[in-house]
Amino acid sequence: MPADPKKVAAASPVYLDARSVQACLTDEEVYDIVSKTLRDLNTDRVIKGPKSGFGVDIDGGHLHMGSVSGCVLSSSAAGIKWFTVSDKNPSRNLPRVPATIVVCNAETGLLDGVLDGTQLTSERTAAMAVAAASACGRRPLKRAAVVGAGAIGHSLVKFLAATQAVDRIAVASLKESTARHACEVAAFLRRGVTLSATSDVRAAVADADIVFTATGVPEDTDLVRAAWLKADAIVCWLGSRREVDIELISEAWIVVDDPDGVKMRRSEFREGGAGWNRIVGNVANVMSGQLHLPEGVEKILLSLAGIGVLDVALGARAIANARRKGIGVPLEPDRR
């Protein structure tokens, strides 16, 4: 249950590091909060804030820095997430996209807490993708493929195994050993699901009902081609760069999470691009039943750029749970 706004306003703000965040949110909570917030996106209970970003060149490397924000009235929470995309970070043994979430009380504007949002971003992205893609299913989705075995790929496998009635999950990665590790992490979650690892993307997606791409490719790449897919496959593209071929963008029924954000992030959906004027609606429309799925045999492409209000919703719940558990570092004396 959401924390009492009056108590939140009076309590000292807290800081939660990555381990504390993990201790304060179960996988079930993450999936449920993300699903509910997505369904509520077109209501006055959830407000999407602005998304902004800019490029910075430092020591021969290019970084993208940005922020996403929003407000969840049911939790009396408003906030912002600051993130940086650094392709050099993995070679430094650092996360590619570090993130920090700041949550305030929506009624008073007082700081509620600050938390490490790096792993939580991967969790919410995967939960969002699985929830949105499953809502696009026109028949039982039994076979899934995940292309990419990084943090988001691991979380995708986990949420697929835990929340969907799939029979098989194939994980494809440049290194088969990396894909195998993603399978091992999810193996204990549910019996009856077959997990397989491969470095062959085409083989992984060939008979999949649903395909997720979540890689860190540095440039646009035809990782998944329309010709390899089932005629009615659902493809969910999550990476910063293009991970599917132009043919798929040109022929698929396209749904996005944030039309403006997707156009800002992905040139294919700007004027003149293959996806220009091909977006039929957003995820909230699908999940709330306001947008009906195509009746014929047609591929569906989900292009998800991320919605900041999901981070705020998860951050607010983590902070509320932390207070109940006595977890977190107080940032100032108690206001009560």
Region roles according to the model:
Residues 143-144, 169:
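Conserved hydrophobic helix-helix packing surfaces used for dimerization/oligomerization
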Residues 153-154:
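N-terminal Rossmann-fold NAD(P) dinucleotide-binding loop
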Residues 162-189:
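NAD(P)-binding Rossmann-fold cofactor-contacting core
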